[in-house]
Amino acid sequence: MWVVRYQNTLEDGSISFISCCLQAFKTYSIGRSSKNPLIIKNDKSISRQHITFKWEINNSSDLKHSSLCLVNKGKLTSLNKKFMKVGETFTINASDVLKSTIIELGTTPIRIEFEWINEVWNIPPHLTQFRTMLSEYGISTEISINDIPANLMISDYPKSEDNSIRELYALVSTIPMKKSRFLMELCNTLLPTSKTNLKFDEMWNDMISNPEYNVFDFDPNILLSKFMRLNNIRVLTTIKSEPRLSSLLRTFNINLFAFDNIDSLYKYVDSLEASTEYLILTTTDKKENGKILCTIKTMLTSIIDGTLSAVINMKGASSRTLDNGKFDQISEGMSTILKTSRAPEVEASPVVSKKRKLNRRRVLPLDSLDFFAGGLSTKTLSENRSLTDAKRLNCGAESKTVISSPNIAEADEKHAPFLQNALKPTEDIGKKSGHSSPGAIIVSSPNLGTVNTSEDSLDKSLQSHKLPQPSLPEVAGIGSQTISSNSADYETAAVNSMDDAEVTKNFRVNHHQNIEQPSKNIRKLSNYSREISSPLQENCKSPVKELSIKEKSGTPHAFVEAIQETKNREVKRVKSTIVELKDEELSEEAINQLKNLAIVEPSNNLLRKSFDSEGNKTSRTTEKWENSLMEPEWHKRKNFKTFVKVRPKSKAHKEEGKNNTQSSDFIRNAAFLITRNYVPLKKYSKKDTTTKWGTEENEDMFALTEMERFGSNTFMSDNINSNTIQKRSQALNRFTNEDSSNEGEEDSFSFSRCSGTAASVQPLKNKIFITDEDDLGDIDDKSDRLNHRENNRNLFVVKEMNLRPNLSEECSKQSRHSRSATSRSRGSFGASNNGDGDDDDDDGPKFTFKRRKG
């Protein structure tokens, strides 16, 4: 196939990829004209019909010998980096094209790619009508299997009529196989529209990769593993019409044995060894002389489907089949006998235990499920220990143990007869010994409809025991006669081998009133037998005595205790970290509670405790859990705790009934007052251009600011000369005086020391009041009292009242008015205190005002 490809930039800036499959004997052209089949726009360097081309089939039937002829009509055209002249012709042979040929058009340039794709398809004989159309678009077709390798195989499998030799050839040669529907759709839709629909590459790739057109669903690469099943099987055939069959099977290392006729094939089969597998290939599927004959199509289908054993024969398979049938019948009969044979009861003689084992405590095997995920096993150990010790009791030579079958049908109907039969031997023993009281009770615990997985059925059955026989009280339900203390048979069958819980467990029958009374009687007898101490009872191997013997042993007892303590400690540790999740804990509401969850180490200090009326600490969570039916917030979660922010009581008391923002506002207002009093601020003005910190005139102002910053933390003595400070203040007043226009007129301002708040600026809240001259005496008294309070603090603080010599008109009027008012008040104040004499207090401020009136 000849395919031309190029890309073009459209008006909107997007790139269009164009590909077209060329039809034989048809002329194509590329240019800016819309009459061209292939159009290139938005490039003035390309002619309206820049280049024309067509391909032709030579006299040879092989399409590889076809050629593509190019005619250049444009000004800027280069082929393989060489410019072509206008009207120049160039021919490209398909056999010489190893890679695509590229032609560049225009100044940009636009690359045009011409490629020859060699396509050889093998089609069935009944689809030859498509060969002409396929050849026009450069696709070669073959019908028979020859040495020319094919790129694609068209098949009608499994409806093929050629014995599926073509499919076998395709599988062996790993040639993709497509259905005949693929060929029809390609010739009817894709190829005819390739001239108008310039997206040939996309449509071609979509059809080739579509799995709907595949004959087999599996990957051809795994076909080798499927044919490997024939390696150990001999393939026999009488087909002579397929000469390539042997070479195809030899590809998978399969040996094919060909015979002239079927008789010679049977003779070869008879000469084979026993249990040899072989496969017979013929022209028809049939079964003859007990042998399976199949065709190539059937063999291929069985290999692909994995049912190859259905067509394989084996030498001597018939005799082996009979033997297998007999063996199956025998095995079925034996299984039936084993299922039906079952002993209901087995009588066993008492087991004599070794004396050495009496001094050793039994260590039960570790149950991994109970050890790692279960609870403490102290209860289970006590039950197993008591049952084991009870089995070891030696109750005499005539005693027998009755082992009941674990499966007893209709247990509810046999409960009462079983207890009655169990009580009969006691009366017989009483008669033989000369006593009228009941005797031994044979204790048996068959499985009465209940299932207990923790104990074996043999462990549930207990040995028959006899009761000790000192004078006993009357027992209701058993008899009214007393039991004497002289019978040794009663002593050897003491029921004290079981505690109250075990007796009730062995005789427990749900919802049965006839068994409740005997169990109570036995409990009374067992309780009474524990209080008896006699020489006969000492000889009896009771669990109490045996336990005391075990406790006397040193090393084994300590070893067992260490094992049990380790197990219990590990179980507690695992249970503290592994908990069971409930369905309620996985709901969305429960998961949302985790946002206030914090995982901490378990500690008693984290639990908030309350005090009761007597002053003792009690846990609130425990009382809440005991008094209510609801579970706590994090039940059984020791390391879960919900933290709630609690405000201190002092702040809560102050802010009670107030808005939460008032506290922050109070702090912000207080900070504003502090910064306003101690940080000099300057109002920005466009007209204020005289103040420059780089000039020499402002050196005193900068020094004054530095003194204010460090003055609050600097303690100075009274002996420091104040003339330096007075000179700096006078220099400062020269810059800040608004009436500096009058020559020779200047305000002299001096003071000896700043004491308290008398010389400082009034607070903000007092600035709204105007002080009258009549109240200056009261102010002087207040300032004297404040000076006495701060005698120990000798701080020199200089306040800068106005550092801006040139202000706006509005600011100058305000400052002049305030300064004149202050001058008058201070002048009168200084005049009144000027003639006080030396008796005045030296700590008070001394002011002197001089002003010339012009």
Swiss-Prot record:
Locate the Phosphothreonine modifications and list their residues. Answer: T555
Question: Where does it live in the cell?
Answer: Nucleus; Chromosome; Chromosome, Telomere
Coarse class of the protein's main subcellular location: nucleus
According to its UniProt entry, the protein's GO biological process terms are: base-excision repair; double-strand break repair; double-strand break repair via nonhomologous end joining; maintenance of DNA trinucleotide repeats; meiotic DNA double-strand break formation; mitochondrial double-strand break repair via homologous recombination; R-loop processing; sporulation resulting in formation of a cellular spore
What InterPro entries does the entry give?
Answer: FHA_dom, SMAD_FHA_dom_sf
Q: Which residues lie within the region annotated Disordered? A: 429-455, 807-854
What is the protein's known function?
Component of the MRN complex, which plays a central role in double-strand break (DSB) repair, DNA recombination, maintenance of telomere integrity and meiosis. The MRN complex is involved in the repair of DNA double-strand breaks (DSBs) via homologous recombination (HR), an error-free mechanism which primarily occurs during S and G2 phases. The complex (1) mediates the end resection of damaged DNA, which generates proper single-stranded DNA, a key initial steps in HR, and is (2) required for the recruitment of other repair factors and efficient activation of ATM and ATR upon DNA damage.
Q: What is this protein called?
A: DNA repair protein XRS2
Say which species the protein is native to: Saccharomyces cerevisiae (strain ATCC 204508 / S288c) (Baker's yeast)
Organism taxonomic ancestry? Eukaryota, Fungi, Dikarya, Ascomycota, Saccharomycotina
